[in-house]
């Protein structure tokens, strides 16, 4: 294990009274420092800025309106990072604040720049402390308490391990807070099994809960990143995981040969619309090597521009691919169902292909 992404949630960073868990965070940073000094590269994805801001402002209940959440985050983010900076400094390590939004994943150039920046920081033995830029985010501020962000960062860096730290010992067969018979799940070999688990809701401090963690684990597993969900309050939890101790829930990864571009397209680029295709087009795409042509498109859903990502669904409604469209939703509605020669006669300025095969990834291909 060389590169590790560690995500710590709001319920681990702060208690129910909005105080930072200073002793716990000091232990976590010491654990990370030991890994870095041992030659490993660690990225810390940390929630808690909103809770930290609430404490400073004297706001006891987590705000529900986005402007209030953003204001609390603006107050808390700097203070939270300053605390991490002091803790890492105690171990002669430098921390770097990295704030990301979905737009950084949406645009390929921004995505590559973010990846290159993180890689350079890691080569310098700097610990990137990543959080969503809640002050400018909109829908992103409810993005699963950073779980999916952590998975996307792990995929971006092709990390060896994603660790999601929470206030429970891992995933259970049911919610242990309400069911005394709930059993800890030690290993998940098929990530699709996670959907069957009855996981609990988010804590008072956080936004995601275990459901966000299972979604992140499924995403990471498909991109060949192993995930461990464990209790962040356990001393030395990261070192224990890295050395192979039986700690938390381990979700195994699937080997993949997908390119960095296809992983970005599948997991980072937001989908702006959906294209329904006929059976012939679905079959041609599934066999690989084919582009999506207008003649195979039966319905267009959503509002999108050329260059946006769209989901492609078969007649039964199953998503079979994602790709970057060459035309807007408005143009595609005009030309769907047309053969190439008809398209050229009606709209000669449009491409013959709706999605070129080089800009398309089959669902499941990333696990191949």
Role assignments for model-derived ranges:
Residues 1-94, 98-368:
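C-terminal catalytic "cap/lid" subdomain
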């Amino acid at each position: 294990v060389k590169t590790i992404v560690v995500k710590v949630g709001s319920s681990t960073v702060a208690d129910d009274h909005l105080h930072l868990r200073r002793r716990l965070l000091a232990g976590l940073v010491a654990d990370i420092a030991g890994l870095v000094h041992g030659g490993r590269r660690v990225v810390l994805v940390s929630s808690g800025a909103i809770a930290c801001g609430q404490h400073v402002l004297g706001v006891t209940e987590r705000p529900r309106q986005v402007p209030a959440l953003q204001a609390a985050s603006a107050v808390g983010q700097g203070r939270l990072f300053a605390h991490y900076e002091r803790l890492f400094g105690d171990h002669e390590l430098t921390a770097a604040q990295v704030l990301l939004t979905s737009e950084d994943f949406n645009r390929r150039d921004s995505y590559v720049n973010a990846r290159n920046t993180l890689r350079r920081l890691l080569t310098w033995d700097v610990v990137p402390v990543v959080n969503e830029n809640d002050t400018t985010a909109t829908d992103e501020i409810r993005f699963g308490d950073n779980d999916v962000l952590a998975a996307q960062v792990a995929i971006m860096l092709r990390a060896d391990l994603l660790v999601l730290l929470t206030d429970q010992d891992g995933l259970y067969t049911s919610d242990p807070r309400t069911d005394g018979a709930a059993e800890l799940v030690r290993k998940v070999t098929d990530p699709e099994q996670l959907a069957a688990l009855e996981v609990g809701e988010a804590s008072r401090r956080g936004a995601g809960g275990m459901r966000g963690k299972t979604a992140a684990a499924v995403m990471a597993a498909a991109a060949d990143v192993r995930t461990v969900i464990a209790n962040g309050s356990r001393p030395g939890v990261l070192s224990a995981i890295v050395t192979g101790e039986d700690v938390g829930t381990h979700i195994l990864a699937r080997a993949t040969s997908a390119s960095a571009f296809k992983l970005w397209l599948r997991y980072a680029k937001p989908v702006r619309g959906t294209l329904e295709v006929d059976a012939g087009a679905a079959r041609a795409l599934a066999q690989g090597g084919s582009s999506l042509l207008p003649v195979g498109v039966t319905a267009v859903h959503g509002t999108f521009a050329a260059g946006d990502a769209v989901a492609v669904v078969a007649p039964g409604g199953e998503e079979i691919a994602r790709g970057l469209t060459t035309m807007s939703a408005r143009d595609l509605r005009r030309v769907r169902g047309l053969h190439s020669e008809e398209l050229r006669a009606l709209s000669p300025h449009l491409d013959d292909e709706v999605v070129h095969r080089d800009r398309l990834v089959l669902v499941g291909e990333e696990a191949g």
